[in-house]
Design a protein with these regions (language model features):
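Domain-terminus/edge residues, biased toward the C-terminal soluble/receptor-binding domains
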Residues: 199-200, 213-216, 220-465, 469-491
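Cytoplasmic C-terminal tails of single-pass
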Residues: 482-524
């Protein structure tokens, strides 16, 4: 085959092989990248226990039967709800969907709407607001107030503190009027927001909670409202403020507001003797119809609780004081859970989980994996009977993706993840990492990758294309040669015939010359 015919074929082969290598490399890179995806967000930080429970709404903590047995006779209120603030799981519930009057717990929704209006920019904390003429119109004798006078001006922020920590009913009316233009419009917004939060047993008739037949809620709905409210930093700050000073106004001297919540304020003007160092916020409430009500949170050793008590009783003590059931029930619930529950490791970072096959290892064909960090959960005390057996679901990225794990591997390299669950509730997910290094066998690595290269589907397709190109090129050459031969054959025949005719003509001419010169012929 001539040189000029070989060059195009070699060029085609080189181009196809050049295209194959990047495709193979890209495929290998993708395989490596998929073995170590980004860490998930629900892994606990090192040394800091965090709840990672993915619980269905309405699920209970492990050991909740023991909580119920312990607290059923101790708690007196009509409705009680004790919840893990992080996971949303219940420790204890009593009549949480029963209709109840919220009293001043209503103000949680009032403050939530006001805070959301501030966050939207509809109103501002430093706005100057004047108490309008009818702000005391629907008050009853003995209702809590901050002695706000008609025509008195103060900042919108100060009105919020009056409403929340002093439980001032007239301040709620002023806030409602300022945010929505009228109390009726504000109340409509309260009910709309309750529906948005998933409340199904709630209807508000005013922004402060004084008794009305059509003003009611449930402990379950109040949990939904409070959970949303506490997610706003301004709300959390206000409801946990023990003292707040309102500067002198146009009608009043400087006044100091004192939080009614005796859990956080030992000098509460209403409920003394219940101070609890682990408590924060949220709101007290009381009317004759509602009984003594309290929503609060508490945190101890990383365990965070939210407690709702509705319909607590007031019981006379022997010393002439009154025991307020909303507070005593709350403290009983907190103390029992904190003494019987705590953070426990359910998977340790030192646990060896399983062996994962590895290709091209120099000293072995597998690697041991362990959790990247300890997985902890809030569980009953370690000495409780019947410690739960958690289920472990292991996902190895290479096995999931159908691509083998390959050496070299460094200790700490992410190779998968571990999900820990119990009865369908996920208690944590953590990355799995290599526990040791796995060095690579260079010979096996090279041989394996060469074999992998030539068995790669992309390479096989390209090689097939090269073979087909070669076959096609040979067929083209054969056909081309036949075409050329077909053109040349008639020409050669014509040339041969012409040559033969020329020879015949020459011979004929020679004979004629002899015929014209007989003498010459004779001389010869």
């Amino acid at each position: 085959m001539k040189k000029y015919r070989i060059l195009p074929l070699l060029l085609i082969v080189c181009l196809l092989l050049t295209a194959a290598f990047p495709a193979f490399a890209a495929n290998s890179t993708a395989s490596t990248a998929e073995q170590s995806p980004e860490p998930t967000a629900n892994a606990a930080s090192d040394g800091v226990p965090q709840s990672t429970v993915q619980a269905q709404e309405g699920s209970y903590v492990l050991g909740s039967d023991a909580v119920k047995t312990a607290l059923d006779e101790k708690l007196q209120a009509n409705c009680v709800m004790l919840v893990d603030e992080d996971s949303g799981q219940y420790y204890y519930t009593r009549n949480i969907d029963a209709k109840a009057y919220p009293a001043s717990l209503t103000k949680i929704m009032t403050l939530l709407l006001a805070v959301e209006a501030v966050e939207r920019g509809d109103v501002h904390l430093d706005d100057t607001v004047t108490a309008y003429a009818d702000c005391n119109a629907d008050m009853v004798e003995g209702a809590s107030n901050a002695d706000i006078k008609v025509g008195e001006t103060m900042t919108f922020e100060d009105f919020l503190y009056c409403a929340m920590i002093s439980s001032a009913n007239e301040a709620c009316n002023v806030v409602a009027e300022y945010v929505c233009g009228s109390i009726s419009a504000f109340v409509e917004r309260m009910n709309t927001r309750a529906q948005e939060l998933g409340c199904t047993g709630t209807h508000f008739a005013n922004p402060h909670g004084l008794p009305k037949d059509d003003h009611y809620t449930t402990a379950h709905d109040l949990y939904r409202i409070t959970k949303e409210a506490l997610s706003h930093e301004l709300f959390a700050t206000i409801c946990n403020t023990v003292k707040h000073t309102v500067p002198a106004t146009n009608l009043s001297e400087e006044r100091t507001l004192s939080n009614t919540n005796g859990l956080i304020n030992p000098d509460s003007p209403m409920y003394r003797g219940y101070y609890y160092e682990y408590a924060k916020g949220v709101k007290t409430g009381h009317t004759d119809a509602a009984g003594y009500c309290l929503i609060s949170t508490a945190e101890k050793d990383g365990v965070r609780l939210l407690c709702i008590v509705l319909g607590g009783k007031g019981t006379a003590r022997a010393n002439g004081t009154t025991d307020f059931g909303s507070f005593s029930d709350t403290l009983t619930a907190y103390r029992w859970v904190f003494s019987h529950y705590g953070w426990r490791a359910i998977v340790s970072a030192s646990d060896l989980i399983c062996e994962v096959p590895v290709r091209y290892g120099r000293d072995g064909d597998s690697v041991t994996v362990r959790p990247a960090q300890t997985v902890s959960a809030v569980l009953p005390a370690a000495d409780s009977d019947g410690a739960p057996q958690f289920e472990q679901q292991v996902t190895i990225y290479s096995e999931r993706d159908g691509k083998p794990l390959e050496a070299p591997i460094k200790a700490g390299d992410e190779v998968g993840e571990l999900t820990v669950s119990y009865n369908g509730t996920v208690y944590g997910t953590v990355k799995l990492v290599a526990a040791v290094d796995v060095a690579v066998s260079k010979g096996a690595y090279i041989a394996g990758h060469v074999a992998a290269f030539f068995t790669n589907p992309i390479v096989l397709v390209i090689l097939l294309a090269i073979v087909l190109a070669l076959v096609g090129y040979v067929l083209w050459l054969v056909r081309r040669r036949k075409q050329i031969e077909a053109v040349r054959r008639p020409r050669r025949r014509a040339q041969m015939e012409a040559e033969e005719a020329r020879r015949r003509a020459l011979a004929h001419e020679t004979l004629r010359e002899f015929d014209r010169d007989p003498a010459g012929s004779r001389r010869r």
